[in-house]
């Protein structure tokens, strides 16, 4: 029998943050939200406060030196989490201590905070910004980091004694993690903001959170009209990948291709369709989705190069897709911002899968996904794609991903350089252009199906006027088909 006393946690109200923290915010903990200007510290503090403030657990927001409350509220009210009713009934109160800080320094500020805590007994306390306090006292000829450390220790004792969950907001440069004031805190959340070319990338790190097993490392974040959001980084994809039986196979919807795959795609596999522009990658993936719908299986399509309306108008079987969308059998996700991260993309896909109960997914295309990512994330594209594929197949989803490659016949390459992503998928289907007897023709082949037998034939195919792929006969009797200019053939040419 365990003698441990469980620590109650509070929800942060910040999507994704509780998962990174391990289990929310420990009640009565003393926390620091730190980082450079513009990182979202004040927004996060407000979001946490409004989430947890109730008539039984009131909140007080102390602002020091920085923005007066009226100015701060003017901007914070734009976010969806802002609740004006909590201001009206006194559940949330704002107190500006700028004058006290200028006249009496840290000692006076501490006295006022202690008096207010004793009087109103709030359950949530925010102090913004404690770093501005030390700057003001230093400018006045007294104080410094040592005095700030003493201030922090005394403040922590007071707030802990009154059982308040506390958040201190402070501006620190990225390299200042070793400040003595951080030893006082139970939790330390660090917010980063970096500019990479023309993209702004936000990241969050939980440096410590006592009593909880947080997810280490940097996690992508974003500020929108809804507030601050975090996209947790999955560490070990293998832990979420389900072991699915190979005997359970699903159809591609393309007659002849299922036989080439050895009876269809094993359920829960990821398939890469690679080929040059216009070879029919999207056509094939559309057939896969439509076939699933006809069998009662819902699907999602993630697109990066066209808006959904344009995609549905130009895709070969757009009318059928529109019908499936109306019937809620299909969801088309448009993910095109030029500062995406894989984790943000994965969250969108996972939410869509769970929302409609999808078992089939198409990513069209990986080339478009790479372009949509912020430059800093392209460096880890292969690793990130591995995590994304593992997470989705772990949900029991069968994936088809398309990728465009130059139709170079010097070597047999399945994905564009420098990433080499072909080994990340369970099966590969290649599409090629061939020049035979003065005509431009198309051929496809199954290069691999992991742990399964498959056809070794290279077969010609056509794209019908109805927008479907029709697989023909094997191209026998030729030599050098993959060079683009084959010789021979059944007629001996």
Language-model segments: what does each one mean?
Residues 28, 55-58, 88-92, 163-164, ...:
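Short glycine-/polar-rich loops that comprise or flank the Walker A/P-loop
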Residues 31, 36-101, 266-272, 276-343:
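Conserved P-loop
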Residues 12-24, 253-264:
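Pre-Walker A adenine-sensing motif
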Residues 31, 107-184, 188, 341-428, ...:
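P-loop NTPase motor core
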Residues 1-8, 111, 118-120, 193-251, ...:
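Conserved P-loop NTPase
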Residues 48, 171, 175-179, 190-193, ...:
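Short beta-alpha junctions and helix-cap segments that line functional grooves
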Residues 65-70, 78, 98-103, 131-133, ...:
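Conserved nucleotide-binding/hydrolysis micro-motifs of P-loop NTPases
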Residues 30, 35-37, 44, 48, ...:
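Scaffold/interface architecture of coatomer-like assemblies
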């Amino acid at each position: 029998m365990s003698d441990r006393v469980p620590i109650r946690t509070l929800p942060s109200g910040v999507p994704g943050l509780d998962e990174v923290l391990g289990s929310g915010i420990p009640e009565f903990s003393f926390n620091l939200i730190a980082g450079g200007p513009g990182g979202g510290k004040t927004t996060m503090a407000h979001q946490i406060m409004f989430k947890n403030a109730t008539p039984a657990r009131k909140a007080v927001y102390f602002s020091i030196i920085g923005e007066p409350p009226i100015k701060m509220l003017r901007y914070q009210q734009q976010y969806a989490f802002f609740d004006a009713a909590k201001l009206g009934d006194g559940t949330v109160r704002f107190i500006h201590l700028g004058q006290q800080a200028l006249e009496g320094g840290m000692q006076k500020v501490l006295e006022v905070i202690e008096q207010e805590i004793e009087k109103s007994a709030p359950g949530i306390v925010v102090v913004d910004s404690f770093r501005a306090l030390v700057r003001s006292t230093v400018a006045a000829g007294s104080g410094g980091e040592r005095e700030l450390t003493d201030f922090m220790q005394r403040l922590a004792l007071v707030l802990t004694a009154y059982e308040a969950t506390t958040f201190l907001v402070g501006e620190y440069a990225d390299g200042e993690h070793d400040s003595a004031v951080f030893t006082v805190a139970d939790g330390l959340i660090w917010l980063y903001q970096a500019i990479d070319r023309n993209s702004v990338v936000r990241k969050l790190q939980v440096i410590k959170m006592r009593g909880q097993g947080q997810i280490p490392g940097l996690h992508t974040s974003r500020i929108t009209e809804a507030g601050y959001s975090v996209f947790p980084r999955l560490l070990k994809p293998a832990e979420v990948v389900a072991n699915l039986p190979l005997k359970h196979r699903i159809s591609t919807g393309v007659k002849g291709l299922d036989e080439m795959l050895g009876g269809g795609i094993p359920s829960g596999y990821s398939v890469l369709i690679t080929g040059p522009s216009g070879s029919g990658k999207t056509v094939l993936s559309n057939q896969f989705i439509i076939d699933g719908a006809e069998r009662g299986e819902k699907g999602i399509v993630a697109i990066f190069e066209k808006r959904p309306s344009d995609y549905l108008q130009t895709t070969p079987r757009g009318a059928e897709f529109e019908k499936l969308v109306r019937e809620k059998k299909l969801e088309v996700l448009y993910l095109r911002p030029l500062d995406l991260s894989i984790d943000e993309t994965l969250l969108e896909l996972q939410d869509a899968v769970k929302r409609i109960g999808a078992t089939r997914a198409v990513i069209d295309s990986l080339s478009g996904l790479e372009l949509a990512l912020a430059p800093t994330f392209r460096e880890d594209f292969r690793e990130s794609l591995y995590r994304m594929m593992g997470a989705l197949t772990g949900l029991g989803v069968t994936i088809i991903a398309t990728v465009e490659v130059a139709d170079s016949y010097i070597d047999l390459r399945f994905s564009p350089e420098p990433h080499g992503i072909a080994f990340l998928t369970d099966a590969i289907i290649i599409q090629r252009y061939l020049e035979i007897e003065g005509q431009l023709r198309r051929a496809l082949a199954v290069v691999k199906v992991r742990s399964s037998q498959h056809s070794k034939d290279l077969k010609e195919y056509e794209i019908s006027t109805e927008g479907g792929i029709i697989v023909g006969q094997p191209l026998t009797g030729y030599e050098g088909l993959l060079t683009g200019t084959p010789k021979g053939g059944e007629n001996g040419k």
